[in-house]
Design a protein with these regions (language model features):
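Preference for long, solvent-exposed alpha-helical segments and helix-linker "stalks"
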Residues: 1-177
Length: 177
């Protein structure tokens, strides 16, 4: 009988090994990274596509700074934010927006409209947790980071915001959200 926490332990061990190998500039770092991803593949194969495991994989992609897989981490986070936002932590909010979201925007893989939509969804998660008294300081801090990072993008220009929100308003003038 397989136990899912064996996979959690395995990913933790290999994540640490990847970090050590990268620090030592070892030639075999990719082998360890591939093994980390293989553990996730087996985890999904044996226990299904659980949202918590998707978030864990996304977080580990960022933790090992595997930028070629940032689009995958972005897609995993996006799916979980849409389907089960209650499990998203303050760290997840930061990783999704600051690392993968900024990467996707800078590389032209997403447009400002999607970036701003992500900002709104993640801000709502922060606000919800703050209102419920859950890790208020952490969510306040990450909201400040979101605001700062948004301001560093071309998406925060008055012209761009007016263009996006005018179109939304014109499509549905009764909905002011």
């Amino acid at each position: 009988q397989l136990k899912s926490n064996l996979y959690a332990n395995g990913t933790y061990i290999y994540k640490q090994l990847v970090k050590e190998k990268k620090k030592a500039k070892a030639a075999d770092v990719n082998l360890y990274r591939d093994t980390l991803y293989n553990i996730y593949d087996k985890w999904f194969e044996n226990f299904g596509q659980c949202n918590k495991t998707k978030v864990s994989l996304a977080k580990d992609i960022i933790y090992v700074n595997d930028q070629k897989n940032f689009p995958k981490a972005y897609a995993l986070y996006k799916e979980v934010v849409e389907n089960e936002p209650a499990i998203i932590t303050s760290t997840d909010v930061k990783y999704y927006f600051v690392y993968t979201g900024m990467y996707m925007l800078k590389t032209g893989k997403i447009e400002c409209e999607e970036f701003l939509s992500n900002y709104e969804a993640l801000s709502a998660i922060c606000e919800n947790n703050i209102a419920q008294g859950k890790k208020v300081e952490k969510f306040n801090n990450v909201q400040n980071i979101l605001d700062k990072k948004l301001g560093e993008t071309p998406c925060a220009s008055c012209d761009k915001l007016e263009e996006i929100y005018s179109a939304k308003y014109n499509n549905d003038p009764e909905n002011m959200d």
